[in-house]
């Protein structure tokens, strides 16, 4: 006896998130941009690797620019986000370009905050970071 087929499940209604935060983690090897809502739940993310770059090209400012634009585009299309606070961590070469790309993508930037972790004289750095 044939089993009755189930119909398609109804699609969930799109959550509309107007404001959120954009975290830019800029290391020397890569730049990762994560867009969250105000509670900290991840909405969209992108990086130099997800754009299609491999190896040392992931750490370039251009890859950071494309990653930031891609993450903002995902957040705008799926959740209708239009206001963000930008929080930057790290000192990689892509941090400035990522901020510029977020501003240029048509989303309103309310504030920019540098939250780079700085040790209070913790572990001894490697030779290249000790000057």
From Swiss-Prot:
It comes from the Bacteria. The keyword Ribosomal protein applies. Keywords: Ribonucleoprotein, Ribosomal protein, RNA-binding, rRNA-binding. GO terms for cellular component: ribonucleoprotein complex; ribosome. The keyword Transport does not apply. GO terms for molecular function: rRNA binding; structural constituent of ribosome. One of its GO terms (biological process) is translation. InterPro entries: Ribosomal_uS11, Ribosomal_uS11_bac-type, Ribosomal_uS11_CS, Ribosomal_uS11_sf. Belongs to the universal ribosomal protein uS11 family. Part of the 30S ribosomal subunit. Interacts with proteins S7 and S18. Binds to IF-3. Located on the platform of the 30S subunit, it bridges several disparate RNA helices of the 16S rRNA. Forms part of the Shine-Dalgarno cleft in the 70S ribosome. PANTHER family: 40S RIBOSOMAL PROTEIN S14/30S RIBOSOMAL PROTEIN S11 (PTHR11759). This is Small ribosomal subunit protein uS11.
